[in-house]
Regions:
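N-terminal beta-alpha "docking/capping" segments at the starts of catalytic domains
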Residues: 1-43, 48
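Acyl-thioester-dependent condensation/acyltransferase catalytic cores
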Residues: 8, 47, 54-128
């Protein structure tokens, strides 16, 4: 299994876990969060800020494993987000279509996913 120290879920995690186990699609919906910049967006600086967020925030370094029928968790010492895709949308219809598809894509916490980050440029040229 793993040589890491495993922890039981706390009550609020247990509620979310039970929602995923007993829901129709076995997942919790993605919560779309975006920040729009009309000037001065630096991909490298933002990627470094996200890396720092993952380093300092324990919940972004959680990893889940099954031990028998019970799901447990442990903390990874280091976590890296990798390369962040950058998209450019020509029309609002194209952008909203992508957002609808992205929102429906499940985050698989058992594979270590905690968040999906995408850089984008909207049709007016603003960076997100």
């Amino acid at each position: 299994m793993t040589d890491k120290t495993l922890y039981q879920f706390n009550y609020s995690q247990d509620i979310v876990h039970l929602q995923t186990v007993y829901s129709l699609f076995n997942r919790v919906s993605n919560i779309i969060f975006s920040v729009t910049f009309d000037e001065g967006f630096d991909d490298t600086l933002m990627t470094n800020a996200i890396q720092l967020l993952m380093k300092r925030n324990d919940c972004l370094r959680l990893k889940f494993v099954k031990e028998g029928k019970v799901t447990k968790q442990y903390f990874e010492a280091e976590r890296y987000i990798g390369e962040i895709p950058s998209l450019t949308f020509r029309t609002n219809c194209q952008m909203y279509s992508f957002i609808r598809k992205f929102r429906r894509k499940a985050i698989d916490v058992r594979k270590g996913e905690t968040m999906n980050v995408v850089y984008a440029t909207d049709p007016t040229g603003n960076r997100m």
